[in-house]
């Protein structure tokens, strides 16, 4: 890969990709690592499941807000200082989460942590747009997405081991340490956006640049269509521990193995994308993704209650489709934006995160069983995605889609 613009004298290419990858891992690290602890946290705080799950829902909603604020600000003040602020917020909030004795203060600190994570995620995509272009950007996106699978594979396993030898509080201390390491690397990062490329005006003017990107209806329509895939996956994430531990009666360590297998399968999405991206038309790709998704959701509704193995087998195809969508759609969307990269990245990640948060809320509702809830969420959100996709095919963007 060849970087464009300012070279990274200290981080080099490998260090830059490592920093981008780890900061982009903020969502799975911040949720998956303490998934095995959720039942124990509910017992510790004496709180209902829906209240404890608010620690995740609040995180994702505030992360979406952080994206919308910090992403555009990076177009005005630069990537480096904005990333430093994001990491400081995340690190300090993680420490406060670790020492709190109140579930409501924990939710509050998760909000602060989410804002910092929002900046980390949106800036990781913006830096890729700054430093890579053409086929190398497609490869970089796929590499980062593939490497990010390490987080959901390792995080629940690490989390399960932590609660065996310590408590859930240690999980948040670990997150703070990861943020501290990224912060140290960020001080070595050389600014990737030149002074003459930055937006002018104040903070409000910078945030208003979101409207410039958002008013592109064709851009936002395609973004919405692919973002609907995030909702069912996040619904699964929110209740996976309850499905495996409460419904199927597995131990936390066994749950972490099942969870890791599903996460490991997700790595094949970006890998397949790297192999076939230049050979398979985007339009055909989308139709295949829809077929896989609907087949997975319907199979889960029909057979997913039978055993944890069958439930996992119905979830894996959707997880692979969801992991393919991200680099596939991100590369298409970034190609359409000239300037306002931070705003575009923020809007892109915000839409995925907002719909993911909605999916988490819907998945956490008191279904007759969470297995049915996940299956219904998959089918329902894919129907919405299909409706928007049909609109995209009838819009001016059909020429762009057909050309890919």
Show the residue positions of the predicted features:
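Cytoplasmic helix-loop-helix junction between adjacent transmembrane helices
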Residues: 103, 109-150
């Amino acid at each position: 890969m060849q970087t464009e613009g300012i070279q990274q004298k200290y981080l080099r290419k490998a260090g830059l990709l490592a920093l981008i990858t780890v900061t982009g891992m903020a969502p799975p690290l911040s949720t998956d690592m303490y998934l095995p602890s959720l039942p124990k946290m509910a017992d510790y705080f004496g709180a209902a499941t829906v209240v404890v799950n608010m620690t995740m829902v609040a995180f994702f909603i505030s992360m979406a807000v952080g994206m919308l604020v910090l992403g555009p600000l990076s177009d005005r003040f630069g990537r480096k200082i904005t990333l430093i602020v994001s990491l400081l917020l995340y690190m300090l909030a993680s420490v406060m989460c670790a020492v709190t004795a109140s579930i409501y203060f924990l939710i509050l600190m998760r909000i602060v942590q989410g804002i910092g994570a929002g900046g980390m995620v949106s800036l990781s995509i913006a830096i890729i747009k700054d430093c890579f272009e053409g086929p190398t950007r497609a490869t970089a996106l796929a590499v980062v997405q593939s490497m990010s699978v390490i987080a959901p594979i390792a995080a629940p396993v690490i989390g399960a081991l932590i609660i065996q030898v310590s408590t859930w509080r240690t999980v948040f201390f670990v997150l703070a340490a990861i943020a501290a390491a990224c912060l140290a690397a960020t001080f070595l990062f050389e600014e990737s956006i030149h002074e003459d490329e930055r937006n002018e005006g104040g903070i409000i003017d910078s945030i208003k640049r979101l409207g410039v990107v958002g008013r592109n209806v064709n851009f936002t329509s395609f973004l919405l269509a692919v973002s609907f895939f995030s909702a069912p996956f996040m619904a699964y994430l929110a209740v996976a521990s309850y499905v495996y531990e409460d419904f199927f009666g597995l131990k936390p360590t066994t749950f972490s193995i099942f969870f890791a297998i599903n996460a490991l399968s997700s790595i094949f999405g970006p890998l397949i994308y790297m192999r076939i991206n230049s050979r398979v038309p985007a339009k055909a790709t989308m139709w295949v993704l829809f077929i896989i998704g609907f087949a997975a959701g319907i199979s889960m509704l029909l057979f997913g209650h039978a055993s944890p193995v069958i439930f996992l087998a119905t979830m894996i195809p959707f997880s692979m489709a969801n992991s393919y969508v991200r680099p596939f759609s991100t590369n298409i969307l970034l190609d359409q934006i000239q300037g306002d990269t931070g705003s575009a990245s923020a809007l892109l990640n915000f839409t995925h995160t907002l719909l993911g948060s909605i999916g988490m809320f819907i998945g956490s509702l008191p279904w007759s069983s969470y297995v049915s809830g996940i299956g219904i969420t998959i089918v329902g959100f894919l129907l919405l995605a299909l409706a928007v996709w049909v609109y995209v095919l009838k819009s001016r963007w059909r020429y762009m889609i057909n050309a890919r």
